[in-house]
Amino acid sequence: MPQTILVVDDSPTIIKFVSFSLKNKGFQVVSACDGMDAIEKLSNLSEGVDLVITDLNMPNLDGYGLIDTLRQNESFANTPIIILSSEDGDDDRQRGLDVGASSYLVKPFKPQKLISEVSKYLN
């Protein structure tokens, strides 16, 4: 059974690009347009997800809030979370890691960098 990755971003273009890159490597992809949508999708997935990739700046519930919510839920407390954001300041990176992200990638990015990062957490 393929491993499942949740991709959360308010940009349909980013979702398509990331999803395409991941599907080409054999991953199953579920997408959400913001943190609230992600939480709803996760509640409807009986198997959960193996990894989350999230943007930071999104409407309704941003990436920081999503990560914090997931880390408080024992089902997702140890799920790897990769931030994929255009925010490249040290403060943004540190805040993301402090709230519970596993790693932080900056947009724009190369697909191979994303796949390499995902591969650190999934086999």
Which residue ranges define each predicted feature?
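Charged docking surfaces used in two-component/phosphorelay signaling
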Residues: K16-N24
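Acidic, metal-coordinating helix/loop segments flanking the phosphotransfer/catalytic sites
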Residues: S31-L51
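Active-site residues of response regulator receiver
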Residues: D55, S85
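Receiver (REC) domain active-site loop signature in two-component systems and cognate sites
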Residues: M58
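C-terminal output helix
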Residues: F109-V118
